[in-house]
Amino acid sequence: MKVISSIQELRDQLRGQNRTAFVPTMGNLHEGHLSLMRLARQHGDPVVASIFVNRLQFGPNEDFDKYPRTLEADIEKLQKENVYVLFAPTERDMYPQPQEYRVHPPHDLGDILEGEFRPGFFTGVCTVVMKLMSCVQPRVAVFGKKDYQQLMIVRAMTEQFALPTDIVAAETVRDTDGLALSSRNRYLTQTERAEAPMLAATLQGVRQAVLSGNRDFAKLERDAMASLAARGWKPDYIAIRKRSNLIAPAAQDLDAPLVVLAAAKLGATRLIDNLEI
């Protein structure tokens, strides 16, 4: 596996490749990330991964400086997955000049849910993904369903800019107790880690209620948030939305595929999760 930091060297290395499968990450790789590499291999060859902690998607009071950076361990894991190239640019490589041009998602998708609680987050995501796509020029790119809203925004951006890249969605990988794997799980204390699976369990309860015919979506959301709050969580949202556009469904939308999404703080750690219904 080649480890490359220069955009020009990356382009030189990939010249002539027309079936590249790309997996962008911020590093601190876990089994969830590695499952993306394996899925990428099913859709293209060679597999290219990137590791870049993107300052543009962190707010002023978020964890950019303490976000775990474990490059050497990540390299070992990617080598075992037979990744062809790891693109690991420095901030100077990616942004040699201030990134004055940004990609802003539409308000109705980018400023709701995660976008409401993390202003500017999806602008940072879209900008770096667009730049990475320009560098790698992949045939396919793999994104996880755990970041459901991000997946939808990236897919829509790719379509609207007519990028020659198919976006492949990967299922969320969970620990045996149901907790979705996340690089931020390492911030949890032992007590918090024992409590953390309640987020997925709460979503599962909402899912079962909807499947059983409960169409009072607003009450289901309120009750789920209250249940988490009673256990010491600080929920930002639990939202039942249409999968196609993340718009809140009406009670009469009987056939619309739905998803329930959540974000909540447990101690100092903010966790997100979702379940398709």
Curated annotation (Swiss-Prot):
Pfam families: Pantoate_ligase. Beta-alanine binds at Q57. ATP binds at residues 26-33, 144-147, 173, 181-184. The active site is at H33 (proton donor). One of its GO terms (cellular component) is cytosol. It catalyses: (R)-pantoate + beta-alanine + ATP = (R)-pantothenate + AMP + diphosphate + H(+). It is found in: Cytoplasm. (R)-pantoate binds at Q57, Q150. SUPFAM superfamilies: Nucleotidylyl transferase (SSF52374). Its EC number is 6.3.2.1. It comes from the Bacteria. Pathway: Cofactor biosynthesis; (R)-pantothenate biosynthesis; (R)-pantothenate from (R)-pantoate and beta-alanine: step 1/1. GO terms for molecular function: ATP binding; pantoate-beta-alanine ligase activity. Keywords: ATP-binding, Cytoplasm, Ligase, Nucleotide-binding, Pantothenate biosynthesis. GO terms for biological process: pantothenate biosynthetic process. Homodimer. The reaction proceeds by a bi uni uni bi ping pong mechanism. Catalyzes the condensation of pantoate with beta-alanine in an ATP-dependent reaction via a pantoyl-adenylate intermediate. Belongs to the pantothenate synthetase family. This is Pantothenate synthetase. It comes from Paraburkholderia phymatum (strain DSM 17167 / CIP 108236 / LMG 21445 / STM815).
